[in-house]
């Protein structure tokens, strides 16, 4: 039905400020996955899938925001859920990870946990989907490192790393190349990527919250949408250069 990845990255800006960012990327052979699966804040990231209960994701993030560890938060929700054997639930907080696949999930299903990320999927063509997704992300992770590719600098400076949203889409693409969701009879698909960070900018990147709710080519469509959003961000920064630091768009000539 679905495969997804949840990520935490800790990084330092060139000025020496420490920050965390969290992200989820997901795709499935059903429409509208972006309304159901990914839940992200500047404290954590959670994905809920297979027999979806959006309350698990929403309340999980609320608990994490309130200071609960992700494993305590999500396990408590599952303990109170009679349908837990049919759920997949995974996520990250500022310190730890958690991943759960109920025994009644549909084959092939499973999950992986890295030091600061989780991957889970069900109704897959095989375990290689999960492995490829995890390996593609891990190979390009920017964690415990200085990152110049944040905010406006990601599109206006010569930087070596890609924004997290793009790297999450690339991880989905790697899993999809291994077969992805096995239900080929379902042609209408969807995908989404959401990123939140403790770092703030006068103009926030629009590509950190993207959804394709109904398409036959979810990964390609999400990547194209990302590219357009990145270009639009760059164009906006160039067109209104100085306006946001000046404090008023009225000070920018048309």
Where are these regions (language model features)?
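N-terminal nucleophile
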Residues: 1-254
């Amino acid at each position: 039905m679905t495969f997804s990845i949840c990520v935490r990255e800790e990084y330092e800006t060139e000025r020496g400020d420490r920050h965390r960012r969290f992200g989820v990327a997901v795709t499935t052979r059903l429409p509208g996955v972006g309304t159901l699966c990914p839940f992200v804040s500047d404290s954590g990231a959670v994905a809920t899938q297979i027999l979806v209960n959006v309350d698990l994701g929403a309340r999980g993030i609320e608990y994490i925001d309130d200071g609960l560890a992700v494993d305590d938060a999500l396990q408590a929700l599952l303990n109170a859920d009679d349908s837990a054997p049919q759920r997949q639930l995974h996520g990250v907080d500022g310190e730890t990870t958690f991943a759960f696949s109920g025994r009644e999930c549909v084959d092939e299903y499973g999950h992986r946990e890295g030091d600061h990320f989780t991957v889970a999927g069900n109704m897959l063509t095989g375990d290689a989907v999960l492995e490829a997704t995890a390996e593609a992300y891990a190979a390009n992770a920017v964690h415990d490192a200085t990152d110049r590719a944040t905010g406006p600098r990601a599109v206006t400076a010569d930087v070596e790393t890609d924004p997290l949203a793009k790297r999450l889409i690339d991880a989905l693409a790697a899993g999809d190349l291994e077969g992805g969701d096995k239900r080929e009879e379902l042609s209408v698909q969807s995908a989404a990527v959401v990123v939140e960070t403790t770092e703030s900018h006068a103009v926030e990147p629009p590509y950190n919250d993207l959804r394709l709710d109904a398409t036959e080519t979810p990964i390609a469509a999400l990547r194209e949408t990302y590219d357009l959003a990145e270009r639009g961000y760059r164009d906006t920064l160039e067109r209104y250069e100085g306006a946001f630091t000046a404090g008023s768009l009225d000070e920018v000539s048309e």
